[in-house]
């Protein structure tokens, strides 16, 4: 055993052992309790960043802990390999996305290996490989035949630079999230997953996920957005519109129907199109609306604009004529693309009506308090729907509360055939068509005679050609006759293959299930293996995936269940959302007002007495730089730390220990070079103590029955650490406090005597405990030390230590003694001492006597096991 801790040598030794013994290869063992631990798989961007390192280290610590509990643990890894960045890199470097992707995977896999992760690499999946996506295509054809996937024209966000459709979430402030181009609205045929058919179940079954953070469940509930209301028909005014019909609107507030003063329709609505035929100004406004974003977030923040048409509809209860307006805040894909406007009781309508001078009618009044209604100032109570308000100015519906008005107006509308109660969801169907090359081909053939024909199972997969270098102008597949020319599977006539590819969220919606049986060729999943491993027991990933990825994965799990592929309802039992990794930022302001960011490694900082950074200079020129505060590590702020350089300098165990110690996993982690140094120092201390102990020869067995009082205290410290770490790692994922408990134990062991055989046997137990408690966190050093401490089996096969409760029992207790509430001494008493004995010992304490001399003792308060307070005057 080397005298010095040499991480690179140790880590190579441990990793070679795991490889040779296939230590992390697992199979289904029906008689053994399973534990499936999964971290969200990475996009193969080229290099791991610290966010990855944190994510995968957390997963690895949890996996290794459960293995030490005797469970059959699966921890797989794969690559979310389709997507736009590969196309961008391909254009930049003039290389096929496939080649770029596979090179990145090879490098990142070696990086993951160097971290010492307990991954079963035999289950690796790569989503851009045909043996993976063929089953996605197979499921697509099944769902298309069942009507769960359908094709329709959709209004989409068109990015004119990337020449592709963007999801609402990819449009930020009306611009494309990658290109920054102003987004246009376009109508194109697209394929949709009918996720709305599962909206109710997706909402309800959130209640069956107690292991998920409440915040994530709330975000999903809001995204699904269930609301109860009515669909109301406003009959067309035939004089202005020219024919009969109804404008249908959905509202959650039919109780305010008597306050409707106009209706607003989306730019794409048929009435808008009709009104614009002879109105160039209106047509220009409609074109402007179509260029705006279609994301709800954009619509909420953008300026509300509208234009009157020459058309009218009739109020369904009064018959009054209401003008039809075109407004940029009405979405064609929400309900029927029309809303009734009640400016008196809806803040958005109120602003709009004031802006364009439209009538505002009060139909709800506050029962008490400030109940003045002013049409120029919005007050919170205008929008209330509780017992604080009643209807007014509503004819026969006056003096009713929200529910009573809802029911009365609803009944009359139903009787006239102009309304029905409905539940609506905010959730929209999931459009998955992408006009991109590097994605999974949609398995549909377009035939003039037969329509859209799914590719038969025996002709799957539809393989994406991998040697294409995109040029950035639209989809390359649409320019490749060798890809799209084919014959119709139904009639045999010449036909055309679909050239759109699927949204890459599709691949990540079912990968967790394929890990159960990645080599299975008889279907999408091997039901037996899937039912053994699923659901995932612990899923780990960033909070930024709270809505889309996690919702789509839950949806897909239910689709697979309904196809008979899995037996469970939900994919992830427990969810841990890890915090970001943040670091200091430094910059100089450039001549044009921009910022030049400098990496912390290139900056020298000056600290005050409290170690706070008070100044910073660039190492290269010695000139000052501005301090920008701590921010998430990113390329744009140039504050990332390369994990590889850290591993090369200190070893993976130091990196892992720092990551787990610096903060609880769900909080942000602030990068600190001093913290990394500290983690490394601690591992050197562990090594030093073990080396000194092993060099003196391993001791015999510990005889617990003959321990001295001092030795009992050392053994108590050992078992306190086990108890603390077991709670922190096993129950709460508080790895930082578990590590703190081990550090406390190390302090005790370093000071413990090692004179006789019992002393040395006690240090042996202490070091074994340190190694076992650290084994999930710093596996390499623990692998080597476990062998040095005399164990033939590997530490990964050792059991997590259990607490010996008898070691925690104290024969004597040290109590605090106070006089009139002030600390005046300590006493040692037998743990079994009576109250009288404790009081007598306190009164007899030398220091206490000094402070009670000449005073009469009024009373003595004894808090068992803690303190004695003598009240004297």
Curated annotation (Swiss-Prot):
**According to its UniProt record, where is this protein located?**
Cytoplasm
Give the record's GO biological process terms. Answer: leucyl-tRNA aminoacylation
Q: Which reaction does it catalyse?
A: tRNA(Leu) + L-leucine + ATP = L-leucyl-tRNA(Leu) + AMP + diphosphate
**In the record, what terms sit under GO molecular function?**
aminoacyl-tRNA deacylase activity; ATP binding; leucine-tRNA ligase activity
InterPro entries given in the database record: aa-tRNA-synth_I_CS, aa-tRNA-synth_Ia, Leu-tRNA-ligase, Leu_tRNA-synth_edit, M/V/L/I-tRNA-synth_anticd-bd, Methionyl/Leucyl_tRNA_Synth, Rossmann-like_a/b/a_fold, tRNAsynth_Ia_anticodon-bd
Query: Where can the motif 'HIGH' region be found?
Result: 42-52
The cross-references to Gene3D superfamilies, in alphabetical order and at most eight, read: 2.20.28.290, 3.10.20.590, HUPs, Isoleucyl-tRNA Synthetase, Domain 1, Valyl/Leucyl/Isoleucyl-tRNA synthetase, editing domain
Q: What is its main location?
A: cytoplasm
Cystine bridges: none
- Identify the stretch(es) annotated as Disordered: 624-643
> GO CC terms for this protein?
cytosol
Q: Where is this motif: 'KMSKS' region?
A: 632-636
Pfam families named among the record's database cross-references? Anticodon_1, tRNA-synt_1, tRNA-synt_1_2, tRNA-synt_1g
Report residues binding ATP. Answer: 635
Name the Enzyme Commission number(s) assigned to this protein. Answer: 6.1.1.4
Q: Which UniProt keywords apply?
A: Aminoacyl-tRNA synthetase, ATP-binding, Cytoplasm, Ligase, Nucleotide-binding, Protein biosynthesis
- CDD domains in the cross-refs: Anticodon_Ia_Leu_BEm (cd07958), LeuRS_core (cd00812)
In the UniProt record, does the keyword S-adenosyl-L-methionine occur? Answer: no
What is the similarity comment for this entry? Answer: Belongs to the class-I aminoacyl-tRNA synthetase family.
Which NCBIfam families does the protein's record reference?
A: leuS_bact (TIGR00396)
Would you tell me the protein name for this molecule? Leucine--tRNA ligase
Q: What is the lineage of its organism?
A: Bacteria, Pseudomonadati, Pseudomonadota, Gammaproteobacteria, Pseudomonadales
Q: Which gene encodes it?
A: leuS
């Amino acid at each position: 055993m080397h005298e010095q801790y040499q991480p690179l040598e140790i880590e190579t030794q441990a990793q070679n052992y795991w490889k040779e013994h296939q230590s992390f290869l697992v199979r289904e063992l029906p008689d053994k309790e399973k534990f499936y631990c999964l971290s969200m798989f990475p996009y193969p961007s080229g290099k791991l960043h610290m966010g990855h390192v944190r994510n995968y280290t957390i997963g690895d610590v949890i996996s290794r802990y459960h293995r030490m509990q005797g469970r059959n643990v699966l921890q797989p890894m794969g690559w979310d390999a389709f997507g736009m960045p590969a196309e961008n890199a391909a254009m930049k470097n003039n290389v096929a996305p496939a080649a770029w992707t596979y090179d990145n995977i090879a490098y990142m896999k070696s990086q993951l290996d160097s971290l010492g992760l307990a991954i079963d690499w035999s289950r690796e999946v790569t989503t851009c490989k045909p043996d993976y996506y063929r089953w996605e295509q197979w499921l697509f054809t099944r769902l298309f035949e069942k009507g769960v996937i359908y094709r329709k024209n959709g209004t989409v966000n068109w990015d004119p630079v990337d020449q592709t459709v963007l999801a609402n979430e990819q449009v930020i402030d009306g611009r494309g999230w990658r290109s920054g181009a102003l987004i246009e609205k376009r109508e194109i045929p697209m394929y949709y997953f009918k996720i709305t058919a599962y909206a109710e179940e997706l909402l309800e079954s959130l209640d069956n996920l107690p292991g998920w953070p409440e915040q994530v469940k709330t975000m999903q509930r809001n995204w699904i957005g269930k609301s109860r209301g009515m669909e109301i028909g406003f009959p067309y005014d035939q004089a202005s519109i020219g024919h009969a019909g109804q404008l249908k609107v959905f509202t959650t507030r039919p109780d305010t129907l008597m306050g409707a003063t106009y209706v607003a329709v989306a730019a794409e609505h048929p009435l808008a199109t009709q009104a614009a035929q002879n109105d160039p100004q209106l047509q220009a406004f409609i074109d402007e609306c179509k260029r705006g974003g279609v994301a709800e977030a954009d619509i909420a923040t953008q300026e509300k604009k509208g234009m009157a048409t020459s058309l009218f509809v009739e109020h369904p209860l009064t018959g009054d004529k209401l003008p039809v307006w075109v407004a940029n805040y009405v979405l064609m894909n929400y309900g029927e693309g029309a809303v009734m406007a009640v400016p008196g009781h809806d803040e958005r309508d109120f602003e709009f009506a004031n802006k364009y001078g439209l009538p505002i009618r009060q139909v709800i009044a506050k029962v008490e308090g400030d109940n003045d209604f002013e049409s120029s100032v919005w007050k919170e109570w205008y929008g209330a729907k509780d017992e604080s308000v009643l209807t007014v100015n509503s004819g026969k519906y006056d003096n009713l509360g929200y529910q009573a008005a809802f029911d009365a107006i609803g009944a009359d509308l139903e009787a006239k055939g102009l309304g029905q109660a409905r539940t609506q969801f905010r959730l929209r169907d999931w459009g998955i068509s992408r006009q991109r090359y590097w994605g999974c081909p949609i398995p549909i053939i377009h035939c003039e005679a037969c329509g859209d024909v799914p590719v038969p199972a025996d002709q799957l997969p539809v393989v994406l050609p991998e040697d294409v270098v995109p040029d950035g102008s639209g989809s390359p597949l649409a320019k490749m006759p060798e890809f799209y020319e084919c014959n119709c599977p139904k009639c045999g006539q010449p036909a055309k293959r679909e050239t759109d590819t699927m949204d890459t969220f599709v691949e990540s919606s079912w990968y967790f299930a394929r890990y159960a049986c990645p080599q299975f060729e008889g279907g999408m999943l091997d039901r037996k293996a899937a039912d053994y491993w699923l659901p995932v027991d612990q899923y780990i990933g960033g909070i930024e995936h709270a809505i889309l990825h996690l919702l789509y994965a839950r949806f897909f799990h239910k689709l697979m269940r309904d196809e008979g592929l899995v037996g469970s309802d939900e994919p992830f039992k427990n969810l841990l959302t890890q915090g970001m990794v943040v670091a200091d930022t430094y910059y100089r302001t450039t001549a044009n007002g921009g910022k030049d960011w400098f990496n912390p490694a290139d900056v020298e900082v000056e600290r005050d007495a409290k170690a706070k950074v008070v100044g910073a200079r660039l190492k290269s020129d010695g000139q000052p730089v501005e301090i920008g505060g701590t921010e998430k590590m990113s390329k744009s702020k140039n504050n990332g730390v390369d994990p590889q350089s850290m591993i090369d300098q200190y070893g993976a165990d130091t990196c892992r220990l720092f990551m787990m110690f610096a903060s609880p996993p769900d909080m942000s982690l602030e990068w600190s070079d001093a913290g990394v140094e500290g983690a490394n120092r601690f591992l050197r201390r562990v090594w030093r103590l073990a080396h000194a102990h092993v060099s003196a020869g391993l001791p015999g067995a510990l005889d617990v029955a003959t321990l001295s009082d001092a030795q009992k205290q050392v053994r108590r410290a050992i078992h306190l650490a086990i108890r603390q770490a077991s709670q922190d790692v096993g129950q709460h994922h508080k790895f930082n406090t578990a590590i703190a408990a081990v550090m406390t134990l190390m302090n005790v062991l370093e000071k413990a005597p090692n004179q006789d055989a019992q002393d040395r046997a006690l240090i042996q137990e202490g070091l074994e405990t340190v190694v076992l408690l650290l084994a999930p966190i710093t596996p390499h050093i623990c692998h080597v030390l476990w062998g040095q401490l005399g164990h033939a089996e590997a530490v990964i096969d050792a059991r997590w230590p259990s607490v010996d409760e008898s070691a925690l029992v104290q024969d004597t207790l040290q109590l605090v003694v106070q006089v009139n509430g002030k600390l005046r001494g300590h006493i040692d008493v037998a743990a079994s001492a009576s109250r009288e004995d404790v009081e007598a010992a306190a009164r007899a304490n030398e220091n206490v006597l000094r402070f009670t001399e000449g005073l009469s003792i009024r009373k003595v308060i004894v808090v068992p096991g803690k303190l004695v307070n003598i009240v004297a005057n």
